[in-house]
């Protein structure tokens, strides 16, 4: 059995990982920001330290890492969280700086392995260099820098796996799903007889499967050096995905009309104006987003299955996420937002 130290053990993904690891007989200790989401299924065997890891001293962190075999970073922010300019500073603070600080402490404490939750946009940047994604999207750039920090930390006694995560579905009681943003975007078209949407698609999996992937990566036998693993269990076109979304919203047989990027781009100028007005520095270039969403960002499930991930009901997970997002959007439930720290 292994001892594992995790940052973000009460979050949607960290909690799933902890549950899987504990079920498999490992010990998990985590630092998390209070408050706990109401009714969240946090495993009682997990040793929880409440507080902000960034406010703890090196000595305190080193003490927590003492005797641990693996460090899991299940915290950070994704591209849906809004920040003022310069957005890179915030990505650095939440997604990169903690690793630069904790990796050396891991090594001092004798921790041999780390697993970091990254983004499949890094995978896209690497396979489509012609799109210049990192120049135009600070979020993409920050995730590639994060991978670089992980790569540089590796040595003969320390290996790091970055899980390049795609769209994730599933809910945690008391926590607002990130998909509330999607409801905000599409509900504006509810009065139209159809929904206009890009023609691409995406890789995806359920939060339970992400938990299994994290556990598999953490306990991987004979892992050496740096690995960036593109994660996916299902690939779905946007129109099929939206079909499930609209069913979950009670709008049956909704007509989805695929539009080319230039048409979606026309609608994005308003968003650029809105960001300017509100002082938001977007992590994604709104004028390039139509081209990203026109692409089938599909990934084979091979690498994920290699980590011991099992099948799950993706349609049920999407439905669940959307139902809670819809309620949240309508203001029916008080839910905790994703926190950066």
Q: Where are the model-predicted features located?
A:
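Glycine/proline-rich active-site loop of Rossmann-fold NAD(P)-dependent oxidoreductases
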Residues: 170-183, 217-228, 251-253
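A conserved pocket-lining segment of Rossmann-fold NAD(P)-dependent short-chain dehydrogenase/reductase
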Residues: 184-205
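NAD(P)H-binding glycine-rich loop region in Rossmannoid oxidoreductase-like domains
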Residues: 51-97, 101, 123
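N-terminal Rossmann NAD(P)H-binding glycine-rich loop of SDR-like oxidoreductase domains
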Residues: 4-24
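Terminal hydrophobic/aromatic helix or amphipathic segment near a protein terminus
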Residues: 242-297
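Conserved beta-loop-beta element that borders a ligand/cofactor-binding pocket
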Residues: 151-174
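Amphipathic terminal alpha-helices
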Residues: 294-341
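Conserved Rossmann-fold NAD(P)-dependent oxidoreductase catalytic core, especially the SDR/UDP-sugar
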Residues: 97-141, 161
């Amino acid at each position: 059995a292994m001892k594992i130290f995790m940052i973000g053990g009460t979050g949607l993904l960290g909690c799933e990982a902890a549950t899987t690891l504990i079920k498999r007989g490992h010990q998990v200790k985590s630092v998390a920001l209070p408050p706990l989401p109401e009714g969240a299924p946090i495993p009682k065997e997990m040793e929880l330290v409440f507080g902000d890891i960034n406010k703890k001293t090196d000595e305190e962190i080193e003490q927590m890492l003492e005797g641990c075999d693996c460090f899991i970073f299940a915290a950070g922010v994704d591209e849906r969280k809004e920040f003022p300019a310069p957005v890179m500073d915030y990505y650095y603070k939440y997604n990169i700086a903690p690793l630069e600080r904790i990796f050396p402490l891991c090594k001092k404490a004798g921790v041999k392995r780390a697993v970091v939750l990254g983004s499949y946009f890094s995978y896209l940047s690497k396979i489509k260099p012609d799109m210049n994604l990192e120049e135009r999207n600070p979020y993409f750039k920050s995730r590639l820098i994060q991978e670089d920090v992980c790569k540089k930390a590796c040595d003969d006694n320390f290996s790091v796996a970055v899980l390049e995560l795609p769209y994730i579905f599933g809910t945690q009681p008391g926590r607002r799903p990130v998909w509330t943003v999607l409801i905000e975007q599409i509900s504006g078209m509810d009065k139209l007889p159809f929904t206009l949407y890009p023609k691409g698609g995406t890789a995806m999996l359920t939060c339970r499967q992400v938990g299994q992937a994290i556990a598999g990566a953490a306990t991987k036998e004979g892992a050496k050096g740096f690995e960036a693993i593109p994660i996916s269990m299902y690939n779905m076109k946007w129109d099929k995905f939206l079909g499930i979304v609209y069913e979950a919203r009670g709008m049956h047989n909704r007509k989805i009309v695929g539009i080319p990027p230039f048409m979606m781009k026309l609608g994005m100028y308003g968003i650029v104006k809105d960001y300017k007005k509100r002082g938001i520095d977007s992590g994604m270039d709104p004028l390039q987003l139509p081209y990203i969403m026109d692409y089938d960002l599909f990934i084979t499930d091979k690498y994920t299955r290699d980590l011991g991930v099992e099948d799950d009901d993706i349609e049920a997970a999407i439905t669940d996420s959307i139902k809670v997002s819809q309620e949240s959007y309508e203001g029916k439930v008080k839910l905790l937002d994703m926190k950066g720290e």
